[in-house]
């Protein structure tokens, strides 16, 4: 029977884990930390793009999303009130229906959004909570 030293077996298993870790991290879907960093990058990009978000102040993800929603609504109002667009609305459409109904009603009440976020976060498992700050 051949005996192995504990140092050698630890080294052997760490190499195996290391090589498996490299193989596993090839796709972003398999690496939750990569997904988290990608989401944080997206929030940073949104913060840069929306002019009403203060750039020199730390804002929460919920605040960023609220600013984005408000900005989109402002852009929609601006487009709807633009003279060239208004004149297009008075032309009959080929489809017959002149107004578009939203797929779902927009919720602009931040207190309700905060409550929904609290309910959503309670559904996370302990493992997923450790991934999200």
Swiss-Prot record:
Upper taxonomic lineage: Eukaryota, Metazoa, Chordata, Craniata, Vertebrata
Alphabetical UniProt keywords: Biological rhythms, Cytoplasm, Developmental protein, Nucleus, Repressor, Transcription, Transcription regulation
Biological process annotations from GO: cellular senescence; circadian regulation of gene expression; embryonic digestive tract morphogenesis; endodermal digestive tract morphogenesis; myotube cell development; negative regulation of gene expression; negative regulation of transcription by RNA polymerase II; neuron differentiation
Gene Ontology MF, one: transcription corepressor activity
Gene this protein is translated from: id2-a
Main location: cytoplasm
Residues covered by the bHLH domain: 23-75
Annotated PROSITE patterns: BHLH (PS50888)
Protein name: DNA-binding protein inhibitor ID-2-A
GO cellular component: cytoplasm; nucleus; protein-containing complex
Cellular compartment(s): Cytoplasm; Nucleus
UniProt cross-references to InterPro entries, sorted A to Z: bHLH_dom, DNA-bd_prot-inh, HLH_DNA-bd_sf
Record keyword Zinc-finger present: no
Induction and repression of expression: May be induced by Notch signaling.
Subunit structure: Heterodimer with other HLH proteins.
Motif Nuclear export signal, chain ranges: 106-115
Entry comment describing in which tissues the protein is expressed: In the embryo, expressed in a range of tissues, with primary expression in the developing pronephros; expressed in the pronephric anlage, and by the swimming tadpole stages expressed robustly in the pronephric tubules and weakly in the pronephric duct. Expressed in the secondary heart field. In the developing nervous system, expressed in the neural crest and in the neural folds during neurula stages, and at stage 20 in the neural tube, ventral mesoderm and mid-hindbrain boundary. By early tailbud stages, expressed in the neural tube, somites and branchial arches.
Role this protein plays: Transcriptional regulator (lacking a basic DNA binding domain) which negatively regulates the basic helix-loop-helix (bHLH) transcription factors by forming heterodimers and inhibiting their DNA binding and transcriptional activity. Inhibits the activity of both neurogenic (neurod1/neuroD) and myogenic (myod1/myoD) bHLH factors. May play a role in the regulation of the circadian clock.
